[in-house]
Design a protein with these regions (language model features):
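A broad, low-specificity signal marking well-ordered, structured residues that form hydrophobic/aromatic
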Residues: 4, 49, 80
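Arg/Lys-rich, positively charged N-terminal/basic patches that mediate binding to nucleic acids
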Residues: 1-33
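A short, surface-exposed loop/turn module that caps and links secondary-structure elements
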Residues: 34-62
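Enriched for short, Lys/Arg-rich terminal
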Residues: 11-16, 20-22, 52, 61-94
């Protein structure tokens, strides 16, 4: 069993997102909690991938054509830290 931790601003981001996207995120979260990030690779629609450059060390999964969930696997512990759900804009906020 994996633990999913969410950044404090995630609740606000999801509240602004369409209901369909919120449901898709909950499905994503269920898969991660049960199977871990490896389970995401079995679902082609998520197109889970490692990020590069300033997001090196993070991963991204598609929730729909526009929105992505950006997350990080914390060490060898069974923890996934969700940073944000974004409309495909990977610029880091300070």
């Amino acid at each position: 069993m994996w633990w999913v931790f969410e950044h404090q601003r995630l609740e606000k981001q999801l509240a602004k997102a369409p209901m369909e996207l919120q449901k898709r995120y909950e499905k994503w979260k269920d898969i991660v909690e049960i199977s871990g990030p490896a389970g995401l690779l079995l679902v082609r629609g998520f197109r889970d991938e490692a990020l590069r450059e300033e997001w090196k060390g993070y991963r991204s999964s598609r929730l729909n054509q526009q929105y992505r969930v950006i997350y990080q696997i914390k060490g060898d512990r069974l923890h996934v830290y969700v940073v944000e759900v974004t409309p495909h804009d990977y610029r880091r906020e300070s």
